[in-house]
């Protein structure tokens, strides 16, 4: 059959028919897609926390968080609720939260029935559920808490505890510990305070004896030797000299022994120990035994030992962090806080914590001097290897005021290794206390403390730059300006004999 061209009108009709068929096919596909999307929407809406029938908060009770993120199905409700008092974040069924009992005394202070374990979250905070279904939110920073828990678990020591606190309001930002024999080691008040007590002695010496950081104290014997032979000041035999600031940084026992027996007395030292929180409760929400300090008054030798950190002084890691926070907070010791707020099931805030001060431990100027003296610990003293790389600070523009302590204890048994610190010195934002017992080098308290500072301030440690020999010689000479041994008469005679022997040879 020969091909023949259709008339124009017929051809146009066929083209329109084909176009209509294509449009009908597209509309059918679009309708199918719309059905799928609509079904998915309703399926997701049914599973949403706001519409979950198992959720204790229904879709009719949208709840806001502190950052105004609202859990509601209606956008108009989100606009209406924006800016209201924060209560809850994302809501989960109650079985996902551990429970804890909270009571209140006559003054309104809250008390937890036990020391909380941070193992359950609600939104972006750690939380527990009370017996009457109220939510208890804690002050800990989840990121810092997870990091601290990690380094505590990895630490090679028989007992470890780390406490990080905001010195300005007393909020505990991280707290973790591990021990095979001591329950809740972070709150255990049986650790010897060791040289941490030198901070108390230094505070008393500054305010009661007029001692300054640059004051020079003479002594004899080794830097860490304090016994019945050298505890009494003797100008005729004391041939070594050291400033009080460097003595605190290097933890020089004879210098602080002299401060206790020569410039202070037992009653003054006991009063300052009580100001720093010893022999009294810190009024924490969780059960916390008080730290104990026994200060001798009649025995000068025992008074010297106590002033240097060898006495009967016991302290808990959380109390050590509170002392550090008190010095960093201008002399006002904040009350440590674990509870941030308590929220009812309907989203209303029942309790909101606010900063509280236990008492003033030292004057603001004294606190400033103590921070300056404690900086010697991290620059030239016992923590120098952790916080300095050659002549460069490890933490860069975040200078750290610190203090170490090392002493063998009995509860628990072992060599106790302490570090407390606050940074930055000009405006402290974090106070840290670390205790390790029988640690390996990589798990010493100063090392763990440095890691906590690096994590909190998001600092990358500086690379080590070797110091040239000329700089090393000059730095060693500068150190002798702070601590040197005076020549004895025997050394003078020996040098005189060498001089005349050389003269005879000539």
Could you tell me what each predicted segment is?
Residues 504-506:
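Short, solvent-exposed mixed-charge patches
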Residues 349-350, 354, 446-493, 497, ...:
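Short, gly/Ser/Thr-rich active-site loops of penicillin-recognizing serine hydrolases
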Residues 194-203:
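Active/ligand-binding-proximal structured segments within catalytic/core domains
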Residues 114-124, 140, 161-185, 208-434:
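Beta-lactam-recognizing serine transpeptidase/beta-lactamase-like catalytic domain environment
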Residues 30-40:
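Bacterial N-terminal signal peptides
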Residues 19-29:
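Bacterial N-terminal signal peptides that target proteins for export
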Residues 181-195:
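A short, polar/charged loop-to-alpha-helix boundary motif
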Residues 41-161, 169, 352, 356, ...:
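Extracytoplasmic/periplasmic proteins that interact with beta-lactams or build/remodel peptidoglycan
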């Amino acid at each position: 059959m020969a091909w023949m061209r259709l008339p124009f009108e017929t051809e146009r009709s066929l083209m329109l028919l084909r176009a209509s068929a294509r449009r009908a096919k597209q509309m059918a596909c679009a309708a199918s897609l719309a059905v799928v999307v609509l079904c998915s929407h309703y399926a997701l809406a049914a599973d949403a926390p706001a519409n979950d029938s198992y959720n204790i908060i229904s879709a009719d009770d949208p709840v806001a968080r502190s950052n105004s993120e609202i859990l509601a199905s209606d956008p108009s409700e989100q606009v209406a609720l924006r800016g209201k008092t924060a209560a809850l974040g994302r809501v989960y069924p109650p079985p996902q939260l551990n429970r804890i009992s909270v009571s209140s005394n006559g003054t309104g202070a809250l008390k937890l029935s036990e020391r909380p374990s941070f193992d359950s979250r609600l939104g972006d905070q750690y939380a527990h559920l009370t017996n009457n279904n109220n939510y208890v939110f804690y002050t800990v920073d989840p990121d810092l808490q997870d990091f601290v828990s990690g380094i505590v678990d990895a630490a090679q020591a028989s007992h470890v505890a780390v406490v990080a606190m905001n010195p300005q309001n007393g909020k505990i930002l991280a707290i973790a510990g591990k021990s095979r024999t001591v329950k809740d080691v972070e709150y255990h008040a049986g650790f010897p305070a060791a040289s941490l007590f030198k901070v108390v002695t230094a505070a008393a010496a500054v305010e009661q004896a007029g001692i300054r950081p640059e004051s020079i104290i003479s002594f004899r014997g080794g830097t860490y030797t304090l016994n019945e032979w050298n505890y009494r000041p003797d100008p005729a035999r004391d041939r070594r000299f050291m400033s009080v600031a460097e003595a605190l940084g290097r933890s020089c026992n004879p210098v602080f022994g002299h401060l206790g027996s020569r410039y202070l007395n037992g009653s003054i030292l006991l009063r300052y120990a009580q100001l720093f929180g010893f022999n009294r409760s810190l009024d924490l929400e969780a059960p916390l035994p008080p730290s104990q300090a026994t200060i001798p008054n009649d025995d000068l030798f025992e008074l010297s030992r106590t002033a240097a950190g060898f006495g009967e002084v016991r302290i808990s890691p959380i109390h050590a962090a509170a002392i550090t926070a008190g010095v960093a907070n201008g002399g006002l010791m904040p009350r440590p806080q674990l509870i941030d707020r308590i929220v009812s099931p309907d989203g209303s805030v029942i309790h909101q914590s606010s900063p509280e001060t236990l008492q003033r431990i030292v004057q603001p100027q004294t606190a400033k001097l103590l921070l300056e003296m404690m900086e010697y610990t991290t620059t030239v003293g016992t923590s120098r290897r952790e916080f300095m790389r050659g002549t460069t600070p490890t933490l860069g523009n975040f200078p750290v005021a610190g203090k170490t302590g090392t002493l063998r204890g009995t509860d628990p048994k072992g060599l106790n290794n302490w570090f407390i610190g606050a940074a930055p010195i000009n405006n402290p934002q974090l106070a840290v206390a670390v205790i390790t017992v029988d640690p390996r080098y990589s798990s010493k308290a100063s090392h763990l403390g440095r890691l906590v500072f690096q994590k909190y301030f998001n600092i990358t440690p500086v690379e080590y730059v070797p110091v040239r020999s000329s700089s090393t010689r000059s730095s060693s000479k500068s150190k002798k300006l702070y601590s040197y041994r005076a020549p004895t008469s025997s050394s003078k005679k020996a040098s005189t004999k060498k001089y005349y022997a050389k003269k005879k040879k000539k």
